[in-house]
């Protein structure tokens, strides 16, 4: 689409979102068409909820996130085919693969293992691999990414090139609870098994999170070498493991419970990453 077309879509979506209390499954015309077109563009990867700028900062296209939210008001519940044993589901969002044949899969160029679930409006780039996992609507999964078994990519989350989300990893979405910006995993990151990154946090390029690291906006991310504390963002090429920090003493005692934190144990630049296995990086 041309820029004027996108500008027109954005204007319609913004106005509709301000008047969302009056929007329902009976709504027709310009609003429905704008929402449906926005979801199609997201599904194709022609637009995305967040884009990295030249200065390294991420710009969030809030109107696209609003289009995703409006779709829940517009779309009725319906039977979704493809359940186990020829059963069905009952939902408002169809599968990305609804109606696909071998031609569509070959053109898309990614691998979709049986029992992976991708909802319409999520984009999956060529050479990505989807094990039995869940990718929610509005998400963007870039080239060469591996979404391993039982991993979850939340609504509108941004997964970079060659990212590996290990088994059971959770990447938070923006819709429930409502977040200002999506959770972002930049290019060439490795997220260890059962780790969680949520609440619009950013893991910068080339970082490695060990198994069971949990990062939200209030999580202290402590650089062991400098003592610096980060919130909401893992610096580039950081190697991060789960840790604890001393807590305040309980009243009348000289002890207190320790509190969880994430610890940057080292920095591994691009050259080091290319020569070192993930397991070696995570060893202290």
Swiss-Prot record:
Pfam family, one: Hexapep_2
GO CC terms: cytoplasm
Annotated GO MF terms: 2,3,4,5-tetrahydropyridine-2,6-dicarboxylate N-succinyltransferase activity
PROSITE patterns listed in its UniProt record: HEXAPEP_TRANSFERASES
Regions crossing the membrane: none
Subcellular location: Cytoplasm
SUPFAM superfamilies per record: Trimeric LpxA-like enzymes (SSF51161)
Keywords, in A-Z order: Acyltransferase, Amino-acid biosynthesis, Cytoplasm, Diaminopimelate biosynthesis, Lysine biosynthesis, Repeat, Transferase
CDD domains: LbH_THP_succinylT
Keyword Protein biosynthesis: no
Principal location listed in the UniProt entry: cytoplasm
InterPro entries assigned: DapD_Trfase_Hexpep_rpt_fam, Hexapep, Hexapep_transf_CS, THP_succinylTrfase_dom1, THP_succinylTrfase_N_sf, Trans_hexapeptide_repeat, Trimer_LpxA-like_sf
Positions with a binding annotation for substrate: 111, 148
Subunit structure: Homotrimer.
Family statement drawn from the similarity comment of this UniProt entry: Belongs to the transferase hexapeptide repeat family.
Protein name, as recorded: 2,3,4,5-tetrahydropyridine-2,6-dicarboxylate N-succinyltransferase
Organism: Brucella suis biovar 1 (strain 1330)
């Amino acid at each position: 689409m041309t820029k004027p077309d996108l500008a027109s879509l954005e204007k319609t979506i913004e106005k509709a979102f301000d008047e969302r209390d009056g929007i329902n499954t009976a709504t027709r015309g310009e609003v429905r068409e704008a929402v449906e077109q926005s979801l199609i563009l997201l599904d194709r990867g022609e637009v995305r909820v967040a884009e990295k700028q030249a200065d390294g900062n991420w710009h969030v296209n809030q109107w696209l996130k609003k289009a995703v939210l409006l779709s829940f008001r517009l779309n009725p519940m319906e039977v979704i085919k493809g359940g186990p044993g020829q059963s069905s589901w009952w939902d408002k969002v169809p599968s990305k693969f609804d109606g696909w044949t071998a031609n569509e899969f070959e053109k898309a160029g990614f691998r979709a293992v049986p029992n992976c679930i991708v909802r319409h409006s999520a984009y999956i780039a060529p050479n990505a691999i989807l094990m039995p996992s869940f990718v929610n609507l509005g998400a963007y999964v870039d080239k060469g990414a591996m979404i391993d078994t039982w991993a979850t990519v939340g609504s509108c989350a941004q997964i970079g090139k060659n990212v590996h989300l290990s088994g059971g990893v959770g990447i938070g979405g923006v819709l429930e609870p409502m977040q200002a910006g999506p959770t972002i995993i930049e290019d060439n990151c490795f997220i260890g098994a059962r780790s969680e990154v949520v609440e619009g946090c950013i893991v910068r390029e080339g970082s490695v999170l060990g198994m069971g690291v949990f990062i939200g906006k209030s999580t202290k991310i402590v650089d062991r070498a400098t003592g610096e504390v980060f919130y909401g963002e893992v610096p580039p090429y950081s190697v991060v493991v789960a840790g604890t920090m001393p807590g305040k003493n309980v009243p009348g005692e000289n002890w207190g419970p320790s509190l969880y934190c994430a610890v940057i144990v080292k920095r591994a630049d691009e050259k080091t990453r290319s020569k070192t296995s993930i397991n070696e990086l995570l060893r202290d």
